[in-house]
């Protein structure tokens, strides 16, 4: 008899498990990990917009400016802004026949 039929055998009009070693530490650890995984998955699905928005905008703050003189910071800001302005001014016009 296979393990599958042994586990899924009806016991007293209910579906049950015939394993007697369910207090095994490995089984307990697997159950805890499974429950934590389910909780984290549910939280991820509920709050995925907040979570991913935080990571998306939180990681785009740019390089650290700690220890950099203010004049160099201002120069860097101007370079970044001029690069953004240059990108905004280039548009391609496509006409379909």
Curated annotation (Swiss-Prot):
Cite the position(s) of the site with description Seems to be involved in pH gating.
Answer: 41
List localization entries: Virion membrane; Host apical cell membrane
Activity control, per UniProt: The M2 protein from most influenza A strains is inhibited by amantadine and rimantadine, resulting in viral uncoating incapacity. Emergence of amantadine-resistant variants is usually rapid.
Could you tell me the keywords of this UniProt record? Answer: Disulfide bond, Glycoprotein, Host cell membrane, Host membrane, Host-virus interaction, Hydrogen ion transport, Inhibition of host autophagy by virus, Ion channel, Ion transport, Lipoprotein, Membrane, Palmitate, Phosphoprotein, Signal-anchor, Transmembrane, Transmembrane helix, Transport, Viral ion channel, Virion
Q: Which residues are glycosylated?
A: 20
Function field = Forms a proton-selective ion channel that is necessary for the efficient release of the viral genome during virus entry. After attaching to the cell surface, the virion enters the cell by endocytosis. Acidification of the endosome triggers M2 ion channel activity.
Q: What is known of its domains?
A: Cytoplasmic tail plays an important role in virion assembly and morphogenesis.
Other remarks? When the channel is activated, one or more imidazole moieties of His-37 probably become bi-protonated.
Q: What is this protein called?
A: Matrix protein 2
